[in-house]
């Protein structure tokens, strides 16, 4: 389905396939995780290009939070906290880099959930906005299979 929408496959390993392309007008990397038999998708992650600008991250996050709120109603949970003591980009991005920022919202939707968050990246003082979709039935199927393996 992603290839039909213009996404380009950039690789796969085990049950994870990666694609690049345009997601709602923004460049993004899409990770699709399938069940062990490869027949069902149980998680999809959308990773937007990293940014070293706090305002860019928050504006992107707020745009998608508004979109999902319009479609699914208010988030089931939302926590937006950056412990920086100064309102400067350097101070705010330093907190992202240290992993102390908690900036996310989640929606329980029919068949699964959606999580939206600002995450740190491997880059110096960079972060990215990430959206995760999980299919609860296929997640449970995978958990049951994994329980059999242990």
Where are these regions (language model features)?
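Non-cytosolic coordination micro-motifs
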Residues: 1-14, 49-150
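Short N-terminal edge-element motif at the start of the domain
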Residues: 1-33
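Mid-chain, structured segments of secreted extracytoplasmic proteins
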Residues: 21-64
């Amino acid at each position: 389905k992603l290839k039909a929408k213009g996404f380009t496959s950039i690789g796969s390993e085990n049950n994870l396939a990666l694609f690049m392309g345009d997601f709602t007008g923004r460049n993004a990397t899409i990770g699709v995780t399938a069940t062990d038999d490869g027949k069902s998708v149980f998680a999809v992650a959308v990773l937007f290009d990293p940014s070293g600008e706090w305002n860019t991250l928050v504006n992107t996050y707020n745009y998608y939070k508004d979109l999902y709120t319009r479609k699914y109603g208010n988030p089931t949970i939302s926590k937006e906290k950056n412990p920086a003591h100064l309102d400067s980009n350097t101070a705010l991005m330093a907190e992202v880099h240290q992993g102390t920022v908690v900036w996310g919202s989640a929606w329980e939707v029919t068949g699964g959930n959606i999580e939206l968050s600002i995450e740190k990246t491997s880059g110096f003082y960079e972060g990215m906005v990430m959206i995760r979709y999980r299919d609860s039935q296929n997640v449970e199927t995978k958990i049951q299979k994994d329980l059999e393996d242990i």
